[in-house]
Amino acid sequence: MIPYGRQDISEADIQAVLDVLNSDFLTQGPQVPLFEKTVANYCNAEYGVAVNSATSALHIACLALGLESGDWLWTSTNSFVASANCGLYCGANIDFVDIDSKTYNLSVVELENKLIKAKLENKIPKIVVPVHFAGQSC
């Protein structure tokens, strides 16, 4: 098997999961607001919101950025469907930017070319969702 990624799970991580499993709450218990506060502090943000999936997180991000019907969202052709669906959930138009053949990430050259064309057509995207393939940042 070709290893795609490796996890770094400590004994403390395992114990934290066991503590929740042995508690009265699997969801919406006291660990959730503690987690949200810890993440917010780490990110130097006022708030943090725990959600059930990256799909939900992307949807909330689109809502927070005011994405709506008639707007455009662009994302990578090499991604899970959530990268596009988050825009569809807001009624936006979806389009894709091709990938770089070496990194498999969204191509900066293709993005630039597409932005130039979109400006001429008055179809500049409100949001671009880059996808960091296999841990590589765009």
Predicted region positions:
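Glycine-/small-residue-rich active-site loops that bind phosphorylated ligands and cofactors
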Residues: 9, 27, 79, 102-103, ...
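N-terminal "arm"/small-domain region of PLP-dependent enzymes with the aminotransferase-like
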Residues: 1-25, 30
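Short beta-strand segments
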Residues: 3-5, 51-52, 129-131
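Phosphate-binding glycine-rich loop
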Residues: 25-72, 86-88, 96-98
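Conserved PLP-anchoring active-site segment centered on the Schiff-base-forming lysine
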Residues: 61-113, 117
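Active-site phosphate-binding strand-loop segment of PLP-dependent enzymes
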Residues: 102-138
